[in-house]
Amino acid sequence: MLKLLKKETHTPQTERIYKVPLCIQDTIPIYRIAENGIFELEKPTSGSKKGIHQFDRMYLFEDINFSTQDEEEKEDTCSKFETLLRSMNVSYKIIVSNHYADNNKLREEILQKAVSKEMEPLAKEYHKMIGERLEEGRGGLLQSKYFVVSCRKPDYESAKTYFNTIEFSIQQLFHRLGSCLIPLDATERLRALHSYYRMGDEASFSFDWNEYLHLKRDWRNDIINTSLRERPEHLEMEGGTCACVMFVRKYPNGLTDQFLNELTNMNFPIIYTCLLYTSPSPRDRG
């Protein structure tokens, strides 16, 4: 069983502000982006705490071979994973996404990371995993797993320093689980968002950071739909694609690996998000 942390140990880092979007670009919950993949999430408002900004960084992580383990190995994996979660003093979330993939572009971008000697083993391993998944034949769907870390800091440079500080420790913890983390830059994160907003049109994604800076383009226009209609029980997006959101209000004390495996291995696009909060330490309060 995968034991979930007690609810009372989680406290939101900032008071959530729900704003009615005035245009379709406002539905994207991101304020500013940096080339290295660090995103600022909320635009400062008159009601927000002065000098505090919310930033996050996203990583791809490799599968933990959990479903094939015996009971003793599962208990050990769960113990390690719980230790990992409790060691984090920032908010984080785990996202499992079944999406259509522009396979050639995706492989090319992952392999580009092998240019760095530090990232070469991770890039090659993930490239191998992508190939195996595509060979499984799930209607052209690729499953990606993301680990997103958030923090509150007074400015971008402080957030960058913080993420660089904790990144090695997080990667080591995932390595102990038999997994690995690959940090995503801005282009890769936008591609992941594009695969949701423009589902079925993944090959059309095009984003160039230098062009974005030179022309001062709105990056939101590169990923968002041209239309989004709210219906009573679903959202209707461009091209007739429909989506609905289901919220699990209360989890049991534990979830079996079989339940999670069946939930996230559907033969249609699905995004599963597990959002957890931890109380930030005084040092992390900025």
Model-derived regions: residue spans:
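Extended, folded cores of ATP/NTP-driven motor/assembly subunits in large transport
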Residues: 1-279, 283-286
